[in-house]
């Protein structure tokens, strides 16, 4: 017990593009029932993947071994709308933290390290599986569009008017607008672009701040649908639902599918079909190489060190526009991820090797055929470029340069900056802040740093440093 509150379980919440919600809310019974069935099946397939890949527990002194568990237990709760009352069918998959260890049948807890790390990948897998299942059932086609109010790309069903998507995305629009405002505000204060991790933090902060309370008495689903149809008449009176459904169902596509006896060949054969279908030059190997390179580049843009799950999540995003047989989906995505990881530098050393004939011994072997003391899901990777940049940075600590402000010039510029701040009603630098800023501006070193605890004014200090540097260079 380290003093932290115990974790009873995990709430995995599904999501889908708004066009699916629109068709579910306003479609005929056959359409609604079909979407419900696809959502149920996508949730089941996602949990199966989660169980097979990440639902493990720990054993040994200090939990040194990551060992297999006999699946997970939980409940699925269906919700039908957003906090703003817009149609948004989704499921809360509440997974118990208690699992039975396969090796000795003792009841233990899930390995939370892997649960938290894999959540983005699990979400991406579910989103792709749902779209695959809907295409399998209805033949619907999809187009990747920029989400209104954000830079995110969303795969929407062709034929669903953007007017409807926007009209029934009230909470999403509210969050997106506030997130954009806070990002711009922070970038103006710091003088630099907000990174992906900070954007995610801002998004979560805004989501919590704008979250409305649920009504004490939930309306029935029929009452909700009546409300949606009334709102439809108010916000989009010119849209005819029957015509929309005809437009949606008039567009048909097919899934990529391969029948193969040997599972090892499926990814290669399927990628060959995929390369042909998307009119890409070359065969499966060339496509796999290109997607692997793209996968790594996107991962590097967001991380300097990553795990396999980060690369798998990016592979799922790369394949967002491609509809694949749902039973083969993760095989294709993970084949790209494995190829990408082969181009990485593994930072976690290999220390143990399973003895011959030990693959079935769950006390020392995982279901994936690895030893329990070296969990591949926890291995860390980077690239040679990142390592070279790290070495360059370290070497730069001992280098000097001729650029920057001469001794005394930095302080003079900061004095003028303080006067401008006072005149504008802003906050000038305190003496210790100005001393730190002058040090950064006048230091002959190629790399220098300012260190201070939270709340001591580092952001304001660096704002002055940034403006001083931009004024000269």
Predicted features along the sequence, with ranges:
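Helicase P-loop NTPase motor core of nucleic-acid translocases
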Residues: 1-473
